[in-house]
Swiss-Prot record:
<keyword id="KW-1015">Disulfide bond</keyword>
<feature type="region of interest" description="Complementarity-determining-2">
    <location>
        <begin position="71"/>
        <end position="77"/>
    </location>
</feature>
<dbReference type="InterPro" id="IPR007110">
    <property type="entry name" value="Ig-like_dom"/>
</dbReference>
<keyword id="KW-0732">Signal</keyword>
<keyword id="KW-1280">Immunoglobulin</keyword>
<dbReference type="InterPro" id="IPR013106">
    <property type="entry name" value="Ig_V-set"/>
</dbReference>
<keyword id="KW-0393">Immunoglobulin domain</keyword>
<keyword id="KW-1003">Cell membrane</keyword>
<dbReference type="GO" id="GO:0005576">
    <property type="term" value="C:extracellular region"/>
</dbReference>
<feature type="region of interest" description="Framework-2">
    <location>
        <begin position="54"/>
        <end position="70"/>
    </location>
</feature>
<dbReference type="GO" id="GO:0005886">
    <property type="term" value="C:plasma membrane"/>
</dbReference>
<keyword id="KW-1064">Adaptive immunity</keyword>
<dbReference type="GO" id="GO:0003823">
    <property type="term" value="F:antigen binding"/>
</dbReference>
<dbReference type="GO" id="GO:0016064">
    <property type="term" value="P:immunoglobulin mediated immune response"/>
</dbReference>
<dbReference type="GO" id="GO:0019814">
    <property type="term" value="C:immunoglobulin complex"/>
</dbReference>
<dbReference type="InterPro" id="IPR036179">
    <property type="entry name" value="Ig-like_dom_sf"/>
</dbReference>
<dbReference type="InterPro" id="IPR013783">
    <property type="entry name" value="Ig-like_fold"/>
</dbReference>
Amino acid sequence: MKHLWFFLLLVAAPRWVLSQVQLQESGPGLVKPSDTLSLTCAVSGYSISSSNWWGWIRQPPGKGLEWIGYIYYSGSTYYNPSLKSRVTMSVDTSKNQFSLKLSSVTAVDTAVYYCAR
């Protein structure tokens, strides 16, 4: 019984902690070719300044996840080399949110976009 109780704590604790943090993406559902995609991720239940990195990923239809990049709360950024020339990320600690801009979009950029911690 001790082992079962320990196992339940081990599994349940991370879910309890993670449930306190919520990320909510917002932005247009559709963007015209050659336009700029602008997305914002609002963070609740956690101070954006308390975590090192905040990121963006995407999943094209029928494909796997693709890393876009991530940003440090101070503003330092790291981008996927294949997207670097078109990506800009920013962070707004006063609003507890961070943003993604992807310029000159084409059909290749069709995907579900996610923010992540």
